[in-house]
Amino acid sequence: METVDTVVWALWAMLPAYIPNNAAVLAGGGRPIDGGRTWGGRRVLGDGKTWRGTLIGTAAGTALALGLTQVTPSVSAALGTDLPTFSLRAGLGLAFGAMLGDIGASFLKRRTGRERGAAFPGLDQLDFVVGALLCAFVAAPSWFTETFTLPVLVVVVVATPVLHVVTNGIAYLLGLKNEPW
């Protein structure tokens, strides 16, 4: 696979993981997953992690995966490169895993005394990637190993933080986020 093809493949494969957290923010509100509970004097997760956001984010990412599968032949032909398709299990693994990764990061932030929205460099950019990849591997191991080769994983780990910083900066400038990270 050529370098450009690898980048396109990697970004396409990760789209169902890139969307859930954005959809969760847009869905907003609802009951916090931690129910307001504290541990060691700090919230377990905080108000930003809700059942509604988790469900809507997971549904959005899964729906996107299934939609991408429908258009993959046309997009592949237009771009002149092969692209992966997504089984329901793969899409669900990526989407739900992205949400779990973000929830895990919130837990770690609370344990280290960081408030909601506080920056945690590195973790903020890759938490959902780790969750998505782990859950996709568990949900669809054959698909995962065929889709996420070492070069593809390298692109994901390098490109995702850049995309994260750029998209969050745009969301901040548009008034959709309170912080630019």
From Swiss-Prot:
Q: List the disulfide bonds.
A: none
Keyword Transmembrane helix recorded? yes
Q: In which pathway does it act?
A: Membrane lipid metabolism; glycerophospholipid metabolism
Which cofactors are named for this entry?
Answer: Mg(2+)
The entry's keywords = Cell membrane, Lipid biosynthesis, Lipid metabolism, Magnesium, Membrane, Phospholipid biosynthesis, Phospholipid metabolism, Transferase, Transmembrane, Transmembrane helix
Enumerate the catalysed reactions.
2,3-bis-O-(geranylgeranyl)-sn-glycerol 1-phosphate + CTP + H(+) = CDP-2,3-bis-O-(geranylgeranyl)-sn-glycerol + diphosphate
Give the bilayer topology: Multi-pass membrane protein
Task: Return the InterPro entries for the record.
Answer: CarS (IPR032690), CarS_archaea (IPR002726)
Q: What does this protein do?
A: Catalyzes the formation of CDP-2,3-bis-(O-geranylgeranyl)-sn-glycerol (CDP-archaeol) from 2,3-bis-(O-geranylgeranyl)-sn-glycerol 1-phosphate (DGGGP) and CTP. This reaction is the third ether-bond-formation step in the biosynthesis of archaeal membrane lipids.
State what protein this is by name: CDP-archaeol synthase
Its ancestry begins with: Archaea, Methanobacteriati, Methanobacteriota, Stenosarchaea group, Halobacteria
Encoded by which gene?
Answer: carS
